[in-house]
Amino acid sequence: MDPGGGGSVTRYEAENSPAVCTGTIDSDHTGYSGAGFCNGDNAAGAYAKFTVNASTAGTATLRVRFANGTTTTRPTSVIVNGATVQSPTFEGTGSWTTWATSTFDVPLNTGGNTIQLDPTTAGGLPNIDYVEVATS
């Protein structure tokens, strides 16, 4: 499988189109990559969606860089091409300026794929900096 080309890791910043953040794009907490991050505004239903490309179908490794400055976990559904494939819980990172990475496998189709991070509780998503897709 070769997502994005060359067998390398491809980064998709949350603040760059075609990514969609239904919260706000913010830059008030240091340590993020790029020009900002997706803040789900602590709301259920405020998701982050990424469009990623894969040259062949198969399993890819998804890395989600996040910050959760609360002491409450942020459970999330990872929806790939309309189907829930993972249900990670993003733990507290100690502050909104402390970023961590959660890693898990996701199935991708050949061509364009949508990956949506959808909160499952009223607390919403953690702040999402980017996702990276790597070959398996």
Region locations from a protein language model:
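Extracytoplasmic
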Residues: 1-136
